[in-house]
């Protein structure tokens, strides 16, 4: 929604969707330890007609994918995000069901000497990935 936290991220064009998924989760301080996918249906991934899933890259889980599904490990970001304004649902953790709306805002040449990926803008504090867990990392 309009009041949701969001991030503007600058990523290199050679990044795969897998790399991009890591950058998204990292920008929200999430662990990168769950299955995920990118879908062209923004509210219901099950109704998508274009999908890129982590499940596809693993031969033991590929059978759960739709015939049109592609993987994320070898698919470049510009394969999924083909034009300015293209939006996709980044669905992370099928158990906890985190929904991120991802949009290609612009394509710009890399600035010489700048390190990418970069979080260009961070609006609002991210929600906690595991809000109910009461554990100490030192234990």
Model-found features: residue ranges?
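Short linear regulatory motifs enriched in tryptophan with gly/pro/ser
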Residues: 1-139
């Amino acid at each position: 929604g309009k009041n949701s936290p969001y991030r503007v991220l600058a990523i290199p064009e050679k990044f795969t969707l897998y790399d991009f998924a890591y950058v998204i989760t990292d920008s929200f301080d999430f662990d990168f330890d769950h299955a995920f996918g990118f879908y062209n249906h923004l509210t219901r991934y099950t109704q998508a007609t274009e999908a890129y899933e982590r499940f596809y890259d693993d031969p033991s889980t590929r059978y759960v994918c739709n015939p049109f599904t592609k993987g994320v490990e070898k698919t470049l970001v510009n394969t999924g995000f083909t034009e300015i304004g293209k939006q996709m649902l980044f669905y992370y953790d099928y158990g906890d069901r985190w929904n991120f709306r991802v949009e290609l805002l612009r394509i710009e040449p890399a600035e010489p000497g700048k390190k990418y990926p970069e979080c260009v803008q961070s609006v609002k504090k991210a929600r906690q990935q595991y809000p109910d867990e009461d554990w100490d990392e030192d234990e």
